[in-house]
A protein has these predicted regions:
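Phosphate-group recognition and catalysis centered on beta-loop-alpha active-site segments
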Residues: 1-178
């Protein structure tokens, strides 16, 4: 148990894929609403694109949550940014949460939003498998976090507390063996 965890006086509440009951999951609007609602943390699912960018999507295919089709791994981040990831939910996005064209997020985009929250916030990153890039996903997530200033000893990036999760035993072992 960390010092942060032992000092808790109440349960922490995490918004799964952002405020996904209100807005399309993993979108700028969903995460901004979760922060506005007072979530103690947010959960995101990550995949790698063809150009090795870490993007926030639950499914490995684009069909359910965008106007695109096919595997996420076969697209570049620039190609994904051209797709509509919010209309499928059928909800109008308030102006303050940005236009539809800015709803798709990369991990660095989410980190910027969480830093701007101005308070301590948790981030639970789920590494999605199977991935055609196998454990390169874990390596790229760690590279992105380190480039942003993440401290592996405390698992903090400024005001952001970072945790990892995965259904993949290989992912869990890989993260444990490299001592993050």
């Amino acid at each position: 148990m960390t010092a942060d965890e032992s000092a808790l006086t109440r349960p922490l509440v995490y918004a799964h894929r952002g405020a996904s009951a209100d807005f399309a999951e993993h979108t700028r609007a969903a995460y901004l609403r979760a922060l506005a609602d007072g979530a103690d943390g947010v959960e995101c699912d990550v995949h790698l694109t063809r150009d090795q960018q870490v993007v926030l999507l639950h499914d490995s295919n684009l069909d359910r949550t965008s106007d695109g089709t096919g595997p996420v791994a076969e697209r570049t981040v620039d190609q994904l940014r051209l797709l509509d990831f919010s209309s499928w939910k059928g909800v109008r996005i308030p102006e303050a949460y940005g236009p539809r064209s800015e709803q798709f997020l990369t991990l660095p985009d989410l980190l910027d939003m969480l830093r701007a929250a101005g308070r301590d916030i948790g981030l639970a990153i789920e590494l999605k498998h199977p991935s055609p890039y196998q454990l390169k996903l874990e390596d790229r997530v760690l590279e992105v976090l380190r480039a942003e200033g993440w401290d592996a000893e405390t698992s903090r990036l400024g005001n952001i507390r970072v945790t990892f999760m995965s259904f993949s035993p290989d992912s869990v072992r890989h993260l444990s063996l490299i001592h993050i």
